[in-house]
Curated annotation (Swiss-Prot):
Keyword Heme: no
Protein name: Translation initiation factor IF-1
Pfam families: eIF-1a (PF01176)
Family matches, as PROSITE patterns: S1_IF1_TYPE (PS50832)
Organism: Rhodospirillum rubrum (strain ATCC 11170 / ATH 1.1.1 / DSM 467 / LMG 4362 / NCIMB 8255 / S1)
InterPro entries tied to this protein: NA-bd_OB-fold (IPR012340), RNA-binding_domain_S1_IF1 (IPR006196), TIF_IF1 (IPR004368)
Record's subunit section: Component of the 30S ribosomal translation pre-initiation complex which assembles on the 30S ribosome in the order IF-2 and IF-3, IF-1 and N-formylmethionyl-tRNA(fMet); mRNA recruitment can occur at any time during PIC assembly.
S1-like domain sequence ranges: 1-72
Domain of life: Bacteria
UniProt keyword terms in alphabetical order: Cytoplasm, Initiation factor, Protein biosynthesis, RNA-binding, rRNA-binding
Sections of the chain in a coiled coil: none
GO MF assignments: ribosome binding; rRNA binding; translation initiation factor activity
One Gene Ontology term, aspect cellular component: cytosol
Function: One of the essential components for the initiation of protein synthesis. Stabilizes the binding of IF-2 and IF-3 on the 30S subunit to which N-formylmethionyl-tRNA(fMet) subsequently binds. Helps modulate mRNA selection, yielding the 30S pre-initiation complex (PIC). Upon addition of the 50S ribosomal subunit IF-1, IF-2 and IF-3 are released leaving the mature 70S translation initiation complex.
Length: 95
């Protein structure tokens, strides 16, 4: 199947199921079964109920989809990067 044949849709995750599967409500009101793409699993991108996602669907089976992107939504900030409780660098001695 060529990539040009895929249908791209947006939706909201309504239910989290076992084995990286999700129920997603499309913008047009239909509900489909979706799974997260391999790159999302590889980079450990977590998908929660209420997340807005982009999906790819094949025209042959419109009840299944692959989640390709999770939209960033406002929420608590992520972990602070940069060293944590590291002391400041030492200054060289003056002679």
């Amino acid at each position: 199947m060529a990539k040009e044949e895929l249908i791209e849709m947006d939706g909201v995750v309504t239910d989290v199921l076992p084995d990286s599967r999700f129920k997603v409500q499309l913008d047009n009101g239909h509900e489909v079964m979706a799974y997260s793409a391999g790159k999302m699993k590889k980079h450990r991108i977590r998908i929660m109920v209420g997340d807005r996602v982009d999906m790819e669907m094949t025209p042959y089976d419109l009840t299944k989809a692959r989640i390709t992107y999770r939209h960033k939504v406002g929420g608590p900030p992520g972990p602070v990067t940069g060293g944590g409780n590291r002391p400041p660098p030492r200054q060289p001695r003056r002679r």
